[in-house]
Each structure stands twice: as C-alpha cells, then as structure tokens.
Amino acid sequence: MAKPRGRKGGRKPSLTPPKNKRAAQLRASQNAFRKRKLERLEELEKKEAQLTVTNDQIHILKKENELLHFMLRSLLTERNMPSDERNISKACCEEKPPTCNTLDGSVVLSSTYNSLEIQQCYVFFKQLLSVCVGKNCTVPSPLNSFDRSFYPIGCTNLSNDIPGYSFLNDAMSEIHTFGDFNGELDSTFLEFSGTEIKEPNNFITENTNAIETAAASMVIRQGFHPRQYYTVDAFGGDVLLSAMDIWSFMKVHPKVNTFDLEILGTELKKSATCSNFDILISLKHFIKVFSSKL
C-alpha cells in the first residue's frame, strides 16, 4: 500500500511523461496543490517563530515590570514614613562633606554595626562609589543626629529589615521572576490584617490604592530631586533606580549569601551614575546582571 502524500515520505512525483492529456492535467494539478501546501506550511512556520520571539519578549518585559513594581512599592512605603521613623538611611553626595569617616575608598566601620549584612553591604557599595568622581557619598548615623560617624549606604537597618505587615497583598505577592526569583519572599511578608495600624513605629500608613496613586506622580524626566527616589532616562527610555533600593531588594533574596557581591557591584557600576543625591543604576542592566548570577 502506498504511503500517504506529505512533506516527508510518500510517493515521489512521476518523471515519466503522461500518457494522455487527462493524465497531464491531473499531474499538473497535483504538483500545484503540493506547491501551495508547502508554501502554506512554510508561512505558518515563520509565523510560529515570530510568535515565539514575541512571547519571549513579552515574558521578559513582564519580569522587568514585576521587579520594578516590587521596588517601587517598597520605595513608596518608605517614603510614607515619618522622618523620625526612617531607620533605612539615604545617601547624599556632597561637594565638601563634613570632617568624618567617608566612603571614598577606605571606610572605618564602627564595631556597633559589625555584622554579616553590613560587611556584605560594604563589599557591594565599595565598587559603586567611584561613580561619584571628586565627591564623597556619605550617610549619617540614624542612632544620633549629632553622631557624624559614617557607614556604608543603608547597611544598618534598625527595624529588622521588613515590617510585620505586607504591602504586597495583591497579585504582586506572587512574583516569580528569574526562575522563581522571589518565590521565597512571600513567607517574609505576613498577610495584611485589613485593620488600621495604630502602633506609632509601623512603617505602612496608607493602603495599596494610595500607594498606586502616589506612584503615578513620582515618575520624572531626566534629573533627580531628593524627595524622589528614582527617575526615568528620557534618552534611553530606561528606569534609573537608587543603589540603596537595589541593595534593599537584594539583601532579602534567599540566595544573597551565594552572590559574589564585589563582582556584582563592579558590573552594575558600568550603568551607574551620580545624581548629586544618590547613585542611580539602570533597571534593565540590573535585571540582566542579577539574573545571570542566579
């Protein structure tokens, strides 16, 4: 029994001349049908390849968007804190900083803050500080406003890193990026109780809708202001994030102890800029570098 006709296998077209006019017409019709079938198949394969590429690009954009929203919500939560409750320090670049220990290549760390997290933070930020050429990136101690001792940016978090209430009580609580990138972060955040937080030391003072409303007003064009913690590069169409916020994001990652923070900081320095307030890093470059280390 002959095999069915198809792209692979089956009978090959006959090379013998047709015996009559009817046979010639039938053979021409079969050849035309076979040609149209192959052309249609090639067209569908090209469309499938294009759809695959498009889906991959959409998947990458979704990951970038999830990471951006995660950082943005964390950033806005901190912005809503009263100034006397901010235990996460912010950096400022000063042309002539006061006489003190500075982060200009050699940092004097107080033994009070000598912990594994601080050492990791120092290793990471030591590579980034060179972008502020001719300036010293300094951070005053939050313990005492008159204490002018300095330590790496955001290395000391007196509130045990994360408050006991979640500001990710929506779809963002199931972020899965870079191969279950944040899968274990869900256990870090407790479910939001839905009741008003009355404790004076709690960070979260507004609900998710208020945070989203504030987010719309925070995007600015090229430039930076001390009250705004990230900016948009008007030329490259990229988002620039504070190095402090990137560190706050990385230090709670379950694999933080497996990262080579010195190499990570060195690679991120390639896209870092100094805004006279903080060190800013390209979001796209951070995603590319960070995902390659997982």
UniProtKB/Swiss-Prot annotation:
It is found in: Cytoplasm; Nucleus. InterPro entries: AP-1-like, bZIP_sf, Yap1_redox_dom_sf. Keywords: Activator, Arsenical resistance, Cytoplasm, DNA-binding, Nucleus, Transcription, Transcription regulation. Residues 1-29 are annotated as: Disordered. Changing S292A: Impairs largely arsenic-induced phosphorylation, shows strong sensitivity to arsenic treatment and a strong, although not complete, reduction in arsenite-induced expression of ARR2 and ARR3. Arsenite binds at C132, C137, C274. Transcriptional activity is controlled by regulated degradation by the ubiquitin-proteasome pathway in absence of arsenic. Arsenic-exposure results in stabilization and increased transcriptional activity. Phosphorylation by HOG1 promotes nuclear localization in the presence of arsenic. One of its GO terms (cellular component) is nucleus. Its main location: cytoplasm. Disruption phenotype: Leads to hypersensitivity to arsenic. Impairs the arsenic-dependent induction of arsenate reductase ARR2, arsenite transporter ARR3 and vacuolar transporter YCF1. Residues 1-11 have a biased composition (Basic residues). Signal peptide: none annotated. Residues 22-72 form the bZIP domain. GO terms for biological process: cellular response to arsenic-containing substance; positive regulation of transcription by RNA polymerase II. Residues 22-45 are annotated as: Basic motif. Residues 44-72 are annotated as: Leucine-zipper. Gene3D superfamilies: 1.20.5.170, YAP1 redox domain. Chain B. One of 8 closely related fungi-specific YAP proteins (YAP1 to YAP8), which all seem to be transcription activators of the environmental stress response and metabolism control pathways and to have similar but not identical DNA binding specificities. Homodimer. This is Arsenical-resistance protein ARR1. It comes from Saccharomyces cerevisiae (strain ATCC 204508 / S288c) (Baker's yeast).
